[in-house]
Structures are given as structure tokens and as C-alpha cells.
């Protein structure tokens, strides 16, 4: 199975996360592929967006349950992910910000992957599932029966290394950030990535690179490997967390070329509201 076929096989439940199941002939426990997509709003054909080019998701939606009335209880990444993965509202989790650790305030809280682990599943994750600022080690170790795959364990397409700052593969952007990094080293700065990003962090990148050069492509490739390596004697819960379309809007050129810039309509509202609630 290659990464593109893997991506085409995903069934999306559009908000934060997606769930698909297939059944083991041996024990009839469903194998579960759980997919998290960061900041994906319903600009999708199956949600009525006529401009969006989303044929694979649209096709999958024909046989899926599409939710049209979803409510976000707290529009902060860490809080919403903890709420979703525990089934508890933020007033119960006590995670309202981007720094509170979930188990510091709820040591015995039961998470979704932990529930499956407790019921005989092999549980493993890759990519962004929890917000790393809200859990220990960026992954919540108790949730997984197999060590979580971190970003530093990912491999990228031949000829490409880890994206600069975690985001950039374009030659010009990498060159600017490399110059800033050397500048930071010469100054004795400790947090090199912060120094770079404070001075140069483009909101998008259009680079003619393969899918596997960017983080999401590498995550998809690793997910395929994990599926092939699963213990077939046990059911699995595999969580795959993609980072895009959260800012910065970085993607290979072939995806940008699906749209003509002159046909893209700007959002009607482009300034902050005067009296936000």
C-alpha cells in the first residue's frame, strides 16, 4: 500500500477527527483507524462548497455519516482535543489554555485510546493527536501500548531532511532560516527555532516537492508502515494526526495548481469584529 492509496482510503468525519473500522475475522473486534485533521473547516465539496477540489473526500462521504451541526466547546487547540479524546467538557477536564497538562488536573482521566488499550487493543499513534502542550512528553504515554511515533522519528522523501522549523522545504525559505540560525548560534541564543520563527515565518509555501518532503506526507508514509507491521493476532487502534491545513499553508505545488489564483474569491469579512463576544 502506498501513501496516496492510503490517503484515498480514509473516511473523514469532518471536524477534528475521523474514525473508520474494519473487522477481524478471528475475534470480530473492529480495527480502528482514527484520523485527526488540524483546523479543517467545511470548505469541502460534500459540505456544499462548489469551489473546493476534494474528490476523494466527496466520494467517501457518499457512504459515510456527515455531521452538519457540530459545536466546538472551546476554540483552543489543547482544550478541544483533550475534550474530544476524553469525552468530557472543558469544565470537567480543567484544560482551558495551551499550558495546562491534562493529567496534572485529572490524573485518572480515561482517554479514548486508553479505553481501547484496556480492552485488549494494540494502540499506537503518529502525528498530532493531542496538543503536545497538554500531555506528558507531547503524547500522553498512558494512552499507547506501543511507543508513540514522534516527529523526530519520521523519515522524509529521498533528498529531503526534516523541514526547517518543522514547516519549510522551499530552497529560499530554508536558506533564510539557515542564515538566521547561524546568526542565533553566533549570538549564543539557546532557543534557535524561536529566534528563526520570530524573524521569519511565512504564512504559506508553494514548493515543487513530493508529498513525503513535508510533515504530513511523512506521517502518512509512516502510518502505512505501521499498518503493515501490526500484530495480526490483536485488534488495533491506530491514530494518525495530520498538521495541515493549520497555518502555515504549506503544500506541494501540484496541489496549488488545482486552483487558478484569479478565480479564488476573498473572504467577505477581512477585519476583526468590533465587539467580539
Regions inferred by a protein language model and the residue ranges of each:
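Formylglycine-dependent sulfatase
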Residues: 2-8, 21-277
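Bacterial N-terminal signal peptides
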Residues: 9-18
Amino acid at each position: 500500500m502506498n501513501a496516496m492509496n492510503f490517503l484515498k482510503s480514509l473516511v473523514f468525519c469532518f471536524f477534528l477527527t475521523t474514525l473508520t473500522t474494519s473487522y477481524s475475522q478471528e475475534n470480530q473486534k473492529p480495527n480502528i483507524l482514527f484520523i485527526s485533521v488540524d483546523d479543517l473547516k467545511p470548505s469541502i465539496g460534500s459540505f456544499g462548497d462548489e469551489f473546493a477540489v476534494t474528490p476523494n473526500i466527496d466520494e467517501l462521504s457518499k457512504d459515510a455519516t456527515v455531521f452538519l451541526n457540530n459545536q466546538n466547546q472551546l476554540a483552543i487547540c489543547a482544550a478541544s482535543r483533550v475534550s474530544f479524546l476524553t469525552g468530557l467538557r472543558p469544565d470537567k477536564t480543567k484544560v482551558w489554555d495551551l499550558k495546562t497538562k491534562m493529567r496534572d488536573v485529572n490524573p485518572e482521566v480515561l482517554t479514548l485510546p486508553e479505553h481501547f488499550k484496556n480492552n485488549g487493543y494494540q494502540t499506537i499513534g503518529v502525528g498530532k493527536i493531542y496538543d503536545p502542550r497538554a500531555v506528558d512528553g507531547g503524547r500522553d504515554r498512558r494512552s499507547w501500548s506501543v511507543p508513540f511515533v514522534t516527529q523526530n522519528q519520521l523519515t522524509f522523501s529521498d533528498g529531503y531532511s526534516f523541514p526547517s522549523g518543522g514547516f519549510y522545504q522551499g530552497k529560499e525559505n530554508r536558506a533564510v532560516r539557515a542564515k538566521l540560525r547561524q546568526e542565533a548560534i553566533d549570538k549564543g541564543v539557546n532557543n534557535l527555532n524561536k529566534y528563526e520563527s520570530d524573524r521569519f515565518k511565512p504564512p504559506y509555501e508553494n514548493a515543487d516537492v513530493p508529498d513525503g518532503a513535508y510533515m504530513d506526507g511523512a506521517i502518512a508514509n509512516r502510518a502505512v508502515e505501521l499498518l503493515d507491521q501490526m500484530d495480526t493476532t490483536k485488534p488495533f487502534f491506530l491514530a494518525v494526526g495530520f498538521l495541515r491545513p493549520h497555518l502555515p499553508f504549506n503544500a506541494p505545488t501540484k496541489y496549488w495548481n488545482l486552483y487558478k489564483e484569479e478565480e479564488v474569491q476573498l473572504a467577505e469579512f477581512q477585519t476583526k469584529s468590533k465587539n467580539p463576544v
